Amino acid sequence: MAKDKGLISPEDFAQLQKYIDYSTKSVSDVLKVFEMNKYCQGDEIGYLGFEQFLKMYLEVEEVPHHLCWTLFWSFHSSQDLDEETESKANVICLSDVYCYFTLLEGGSPEDKLEFTFKLYDMDRNGILDSTEVEKIILQMMRVAEYLDWDVSELRPILQEMMKEMDRDGSGCVSLAEWVRAGATTVPLLVLLGIDMTMKDDGHHIWRPKRFSRPVYCNLCELSIGLGKQGLSCNLCKYIVHDHCAMKAQPCEVSTYAKSRKDIGVQPHVWVRGGCHSGRCDRCQKKIRTYHSLTGLHCVWCHLEIHDDCLQAVGPECDCGLLRDHILPPCSIYPRVLVSGQECKQKTTDVTSLCTPEAFRIEPVSNTHPLLVFINPKSGGKQGQSVLWKFQYILNPRQVFNLKDGPEPGLRFFKDVPQFRVLVCGGDGTVGWILETIDKANFPIVPPVAVLPLGTGNDLARCLRWGRGYEGENLRKILKDIEISKVVYLDRWLLEVIPQQNGEKSDPVPSQIINNYFSIGVDASIAHRFHLMREKYPEKFNSRMKNKLWYLEFATSESIFSTCKKLEESVTVEICGKLLDLSDLSLEGIAVLNIPSMHGGSNLWGDTKRPHGDTCGINQALGSVAKIITDPDILKTCVPDMSDKRLEVVGIEGVIEMGQIYTRLKSAGHRLAKCSEITFQTTKTLPMQVDGEPWMQAPCTIKITHKNQMPMLMGPAPSSSNFFGFWS
């Protein structure tokens, strides 16, 4: 640790962030139960105490020694420590630790800037001297390398940037100078790892970007350089050199109408450059973008034209090919602009334009504005990338980062007629949004489409949105949403009633079933995977690693058969009728609402719907049959997520699950199709609901129909359409 003292590397920070993402505790919760008397002396804590604190905070049995020591050292103001001489005599300030983790959990850029100042102010004198400023520059250089920036010319830019902060010429930077300058100095925010979020209009949302084609700075009009990096605004695609960002013109994107005259009519908003198609949409001739900053693009309709063709294009913008989804700025305005009595009634509680309630929305007629929710943690870095793309192709005020929950977005859209919802994330994210919409009590419930991120995505597969997003054109996906059909998804209430025998269970992850519920072998594998991922999140950072871990746990389960003879410890009632399992040897029972689980495995199997049978049930029974157990009739039953019925399937073991997944076997044991199920268990068993596993002590489980939610079914697949139902 002799080199780079006081610094935590980007790699270490990324590893720490993964641990925090999986932890359920806040730093305040930990400090309430932490043994202060044992590990602390006043406001000081030693290495052993810090290690114990991290274990409690991150909810792990062991923290990697390198990470723990590096983090401990980053809080230390002394310069004579090394790893070989660590002891309880080496102490750090507990309040600094509290501040650091509190800010990681959430905080404004200003708060994070203030904390960063205090972290680098090693002598605690309230100013940053030249040595401390050099440490900050070194840290930013390391982050730049981690972001794959070209750092060959970055140091003098950063030095000049830091010098400009010293407004009084004292040779030092005060806290006030640091916060005032830092909040508006884009490279500083990016390189310190501080997220930039949308404030009010006029602010660029910068992100570092390496350019694979010749591009030119919108400010100085000089080339960025092929393969070099600069900063690109997510909202308007304004591009600048790193050192030009502070002088850049305000962002041209106005996300809402500022005056009454702006309401109702949307003009084009032109930004120079950004003509990536290379062809003018007006005259169809080439736009020569390789030699200079040339051409114009509209940030709303995305037309690309020559500078000379501007006069031939009318002033009014129709929002282009995606007009059905876009809320143009002219349709969003502050409620304070509403005249008369309506204004008095609706503005009494409005104190800030930062709240959804401060705006009124009147969408363009015959459109279906899209409310987009994105889970930035889904699919590795996919979520963040999708967020950036949607901020450009739609109005940024339609796009919501789920780190703040879905409520702000739903409140913003609560009075918007005929809107749709797009959820970008996994099945868990979709379930979260559906539950929140259900509780919001909309008079007309909006239909929900899914852009699947990450692995699994069983519901997205069944709705024809594919097994996972892999960088496809988002405009194509939005056009598919336009022609999608509304279907209704049954949702089921899961009631777990523990027996009064004193045995403790894990918390039940959800009281709602959207996809499936299972007991036994598959839940056992999922539970072991879940525990290992919580303990060692750094080992589960790719799809391939996840699959290998599942394979290892499945192999182990096939050897030990922990759920063998499940029928001896579980009884099943369907609509009050006891299901006979005596002739079967099962290790798992699955209750299916959709024909996909485990990332595309169809345990029920494929069935051709009988001619004229619209309900997936033999015509002789009629469409009102609530329970079917006859094996011959079950052969003709087709799964339907809208029929208010569940399919019950028995699983012989891990080998059978693998055979079904690989299509070597068509299905598991079809046990029943019914509208109500009750399980009685006599021992602790692994269970899972929609992929979330837990261990459950003996209990009674009741599954009953709750309601239906409108979902959007993607268009029928073609041979070249990825977003078909691939299992």
From Swiss-Prot:
Ca(2+) 2 binds at residues 166, 168, 170, 172, 177. SUPFAM superfamilies: Cysteine-rich domain (SSF57889), EF-hand (SSF47473), NAD kinase/diacylglycerol kinase-like (SSF111331). GO terms for cellular component: cytosol; plasma membrane. Pfam families: C1_1, DAG_kinase_N, DAGK_acc, DAGK_cat. It catalyses: a 1,2-diacyl-sn-glycerol + ATP = a 1,2-diacyl-sn-glycero-3-phosphate + ADP + H(+); a 1-O-alkyl-sn-glycerol + ATP = a 1-O-alkyl-sn-glycero-3-phosphate + ADP + H(+); 1-O-alkyl-2-acyl-sn-glycerol + ATP = 1-O-alkyl-2-acyl-sn-glycero-3-phosphate + ADP + H(+); 1,2-dihexadecanoyl-sn-glycerol + ATP = 1,2-dihexadecanoyl-sn-glycero-3-phosphate + ADP + H(+). Lymphocytes and oligodendroglial cells. Signal peptide: none annotated. Residues 365-498 form the DAGKc domain. This is Diacylglycerol kinase alpha. The lineage of its organism: Eukaryota, Metazoa, Chordata, Craniata, Vertebrata. The gene is Dgka.
